[in-house]
């Protein structure tokens, strides 16, 4: 099971994207645990996950969050703006899987 966490300004704007990612995972038979949180809770939700994704609106924090994630052995990157804006769960799931390796 892939444990993916999305972090944005308040944790609310990514809720629809989370649903679309879960639907995409179910369609391809991938087991996932995907939850969105506000970025100020990043440290509390880093342990035991496979990937951390940042919403574009907090992309300015990328270097800081990647440093924390790297220390925990977790890949972290900013969700591409187009996929985020279009709520393309399939593409964002593929992006996360590529980060995980």
Regions found by a protein language model. Name each.
Residues 2-39:
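Conserved active-site segments centered on acidic
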Residues 15-19, 59-66:
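Short, surface-exposed alpha-helical segments at coil->helix boundaries
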Residues 38-44, 61:
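Short acidic active-site motifs
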Residues 46-51:
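Short acidic/histidine-rich motifs immediately flanking catalytic phosphotransfer sites
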Residues 56:
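Glycine-rich, N-terminal phosphate-binding loop of Rossmann-like dinucleotide-binding domains
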């Amino acid at each position: 099971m892939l444990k993916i966490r999305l972090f944005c300004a308040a944790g609310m704007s990514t809720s629809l994207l989370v649903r679309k990612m879960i639907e995409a995972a179910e369609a391809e038979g991938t087991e996932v645990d995907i939850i969105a949180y506000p970025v100020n809770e990043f440290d509390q939700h880093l342990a035991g996950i496979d990937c951390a994704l940042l919403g574009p609106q907090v992309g300015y924090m990328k270097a800081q969050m990647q440093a924390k994630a790297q220390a925990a052995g977790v890949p972290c990157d900013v969700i591409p703006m187009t996929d985020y804006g279009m709520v393309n769960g399939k593409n964002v799931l593929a992006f996360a899987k590529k980060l995980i390796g």
